[in-house]
Amino acid sequence: MRLTIAAAAAALALCLPAQTFAQDAAKGETVFKKCQICHEVGPTAKVKVGPILNDVVGRKAGTLPGFAYSPAMKEAGEKGLAWTDESISKYLENPRDFVPKNKMAFVGLKKEDERADVIAYLKKYTAPK
């Protein structure tokens, strides 16, 4: 009986649309305040503890000139990691799990909607390609 209920629940879950979050750049700007200790965006952005995040969306990981990336982040980029909405979200959820041995000490953003909002905010500082 339990197996039947579990199977029915799994089948129902597959039929339902995946939850998606609308990206809100204004909310993302608020959430990004957690990131500003180490990162900057905008026309006057400078390298701090972390790299500048202008044009991060679409960039190959570990390649911003003027920032000393960890060997792990450089290797991730060399193996093909590029910063897409999906990869940024996974990285922000748990940076140490996504790229082990990277320098980012941030514990992560656990809420998917906050990650989506930060990505929308970062896109404001990403030039169209």
What residue ranges belong to the model's regions?
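Positively charged n-region of N-terminal signal peptides that target proteins for export
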Residues: 1-5
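Histidine kinase transmitter module recognition
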Residues: 38-41, 45, 98
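Bacterial N-terminal signal peptides
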Residues: 7-15
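Electrostatic cytochrome c docking/interface patches
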Residues: 15-32, 42-44
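Gly/Gly-Pro-rich "capping" loops immediately C-terminal to redox-active cysteine motifs
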Residues: 29, 43-82, 108
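The canonical Cys-X-X-Cys-His
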Residues: 32-41, 118
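C-terminal capping alpha-helices of c-type cytochrome domains
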Residues: 82-129
